[in-house]
Amino acid sequence: MKRLLILTALLPFVGFAQPINTLNNPNQPGYQIPSQQRMQTQMQTQQIQQKGMLNQQLKTQTQLQQQHLENQINNNSQRVLQSQPGERNPARQQMLPNTNGGMLNSNRNPDSSLNQQHMLPERRNGDMLNQPSTPQPDIPLKTIGP
């Protein structure tokens, strides 16, 4: 009777007891010690967090590289534009005087600006058939005999 009384007194505390883990039975294959399970869970959580941090770092690094490349392209484009003769910034261009009209001046004869004579006589079709004005020396041809 005394035992029954003690048992009934302890009955309300049974609800606080940890339930038996039927999934992790030491007699079943694949049994894991609970402390190893906790450690494995913690390691998996840590790996997930590290993966997230690495992905964030990769994203940031990619954005920085993209910005750097865009800046380089813009700088190079500006350099090319500034080095070209028809620069788009007229404030930085030096205007040269055009006193004689240049190539657009149509008052002059284009041949008179050369003031040069042709060194070779002018040729026409069939000129090679005509005899030259200076006689050519007669050079006997060497014949090859038997």
Swiss-Prot record:
Positions of region (Disordered): 27-54, 70-146
One Pfam family hit: DUF2756
Coiled-coil zones: none
UniProt KW Signal keyword: yes
Extent of Low complexity compositional bias: 32-54
Lineage: superkingdom: Bacteria
Bias type Polar residues, positions: 77-118
Signal sequence coordinates: 1-17
Keywords on record: Signal
InterPro entries: DUF2756
Entry keyword Zinc-finger: no
Protein name, per record: Uncharacterized protein YhhA
Gene: yhhA
